[in-house]
Amino acid sequence: GVYAQGYLNSWNLGAEASTADEVYFFNQIRDKLETYSFFDASKVYGIGVSNGSALVNKLAIESSYFSAIAALASQLIVGTTPSGSTAPVAVYQMCGMADNIIPYDGGMSVVGHHFLSASNSALSWVNAFNCATEPIVEMLGEDEILIYTDCESGKEIRFHSVNNAGHNLNQPNTPNFYGPVWEFLKRF
């Protein structure tokens, strides 16, 4: 795996101290990876937490790097949303329902971005890929996972609301979610 670190400990999404061109940076990484014979460009996954999650969303919208992403502890920033021209990508979005950094119900955050609500963020992906609008509902402990299938692209959108979790999703009473996230990603 590649574990990149943002300039000045953040990714440039507009409100951060960094002025780095993140799409260019990831183009450089991808170009290098493609020189290796073992690299499978059809199985590239993006996983991000918090600011990294917002970056993974941005890269999924502005490029065709990923076959699937996991956006953890953040949702879409207002003005950075997928459209019908966004390359197909499977999305696992996980948000803490008591997040005091990235508001679950959307709005201005303490990090200087205006976020969509968690549900509208997931529905933006659903609408962009023309998925079935009636989700399958699964429970993981006390957490609800809405699964949107039948997307035109053959992808899937999962919206996982972590009950009683703040910005740190890994709470003592929270089930282990890394296993389900990885199982989701490797299907695409």
Regions found by a protein language model. Give the residues of each.
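Short, solvent-exposed loop/turn and secondary-structure capping segments
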Residues: N12-A15, N57-K58, T80-T86, P103-G107, ...
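Short, flexible/disordered intra-domain loops and linkers
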Residues: Y104-L116
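C-terminal catalytic histidine-bearing segment of alpha/beta-hydrolase fold enzymes
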Residues: A90-M94, L116-S117, V126-F188
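Primarily recognizes the serine-hydrolase "nucleophile elbow" in alpha/beta-hydrolase
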Residues: E34-V89, N100
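Serine-hydrolase catalytic machinery in alpha/beta-hydrolase-like enzymes
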Residues: G1-Y45, V49, A54-K58, T174-P175
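Acidic catalytic loop of the alpha/beta-hydrolase fold
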Residues: D99-I102, H167-L169
